Curated annotation (Swiss-Prot):
Residue numbers binding [2Fe-2S] cluster: C69, H71, C88, H91
Protein name per its UniProtKB record: 3-chlorobenzoate-3,4-dioxygenase oxygenase subunit
This enzyme's EC code(s): 1.14.-.-
Entry's cofactor comment: Binds 1 [2Fe-2S] cluster.
Cofactor entry: [2Fe-2S] cluster; Fe cation
UniProt keyword annotation of DNA repair present: no
Binding-site residues, Fe cation: H180, H185
Quaternary assembly: This dioxygenase system consists of two proteins: an oxygenase and an oxygenase reductase.
Keyword hit for Oxidoreductase: yes
Amino acid sequence: MALTKDNEDLVRVGRGTPMGGLMREYWIPALKSTELEAGGSPVRLLLLGEKLVAFREPSGAVGVMDSRCPHRGVSLFMGRVEEGGLRCVYHGWKFSAEGKCVDMPSVRPEDEFKNSVRVARYPVKEMAGVVWVYMGTRKVLPELPRLEVLNLPENEVDVICLQRKSNWLQNLEGEIDTSHFNFLHVGGLHADEVPDDHPLKYTAQVAPQYLVKETALGTCYAAQVPAEEDHTYTRFAHFLFPFWALIPQADIAQNILARAWVPMDDEHTMMFFFRWTGSKAKRLDTPLKSGSPMPGVTLTDMKYKENTTDWYGRWQPLGDESNDWLIDRDLQKVGRVFSGIYGIHAQDQAMTDSMGPIIDHGLEQLAPTDLMIVRTRRRILKALRAHEANGTLPPGVDEADQYFTPRSGYYLTPKSVDWETAYEQRIEGLVR
């Protein structure tokens, strides 16, 4: 079955596509700063379907440009990183981080050809341990998003990257689909095994009420179940344009994080997980009452393949379709790890990538639990069509400060307080 136009337009991100145009309005996380050694080898970088090369000069300046030399199309990945730019090893032409040809030793100076040659390049900034790229056309650049976690001291922020073999929207929707948590991640857990003061005891109630609304920057949801003494336990999360998810991994007072689901191309995504390391909140992988580890639940033990230099060679997980995502059927059979896959990131990876690189939305039978997914698709499509029709800027492009206040997490509130008011009361005064 052919994909619908909406389905296609939501996931295709190459230059000239509707979503590609919308994404290019924003600053995009491209790679970790540590991936670029000063004076070291260039890095192949696939971003929104464009083949780029990134490098760091000996002085520390970063450049991101088209991977092809404008002379004969040779790969600039093979080039020499020098002070002042990247030199093609074919004919010695050298390009600055601004894309100018600054040296052309194979052509006589009197021919005055050097100044007429440029390589396509993109503006870059570094923040929170990440190199950011702006791929749009504006002469006055937008500001970087002022997400709370990005404004903490860099030594208090951990950045995790992870590549997935599926489109960006599929991965984002996995983040905002909270109904899977009680099954995929903790389906083998019994509430009476969890410490009395740990919120995972509420996961025994596997069918919460879901409440969703649009926000200035995207959408948000609250998933609620009854708690003790006329209280409600709430898990609250956000989608923020264009590809950000703020998820409820800890108590809202301590949960300072953000995940970006950055399209490498139409069928591959790079996750950037920014996490505050100073959180004192109880972790999801807190030991059980017995002292035993929580079965199958870990947030940090991600196993990677060794990075290579090819276009898809960065931050690939060890588990993939070729080895059935390392599923352990015996572990699954005894029920302690519901999925048979160890680790939260690996579990999510298996589910999302097993759908295929681009799922046909026409084959889905969405349930009331999928309200956040439905509303988020509509929200994105609305912004996409307005941008496509008349260039209307999507949310947040020129409102960088608005990203600072949203917070995700879980919390208890009196049943008498409505969900929107309860959230506003809980985040009041929290932002660091």
